[in-house]
């Protein structure tokens, strides 16, 4: 794992699911993390349920947290296991 990937994981530990009071890393809501030397980060966000009522909020919080990591220049986020995955993926990746 690269230094940037480790930094992203550490930052994601501060993103807490308000329903479970557990961070998104421990809940395994973020998977397939990859980062290159130019600061491009890719990962998959998998909400805890297919109809998770806070999926949008969590996705936004995750994206903001990753953006705060020094060295991160861009993000590509895949959404899986969610009823409106296509719509959320399009929305969350608009600003990249």
For each feature predicted by the language model, list its residue ranges.
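Domain-level signature for proteins that mediate thiol-based redox and metal-cofactor handling
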Residues: 1-96
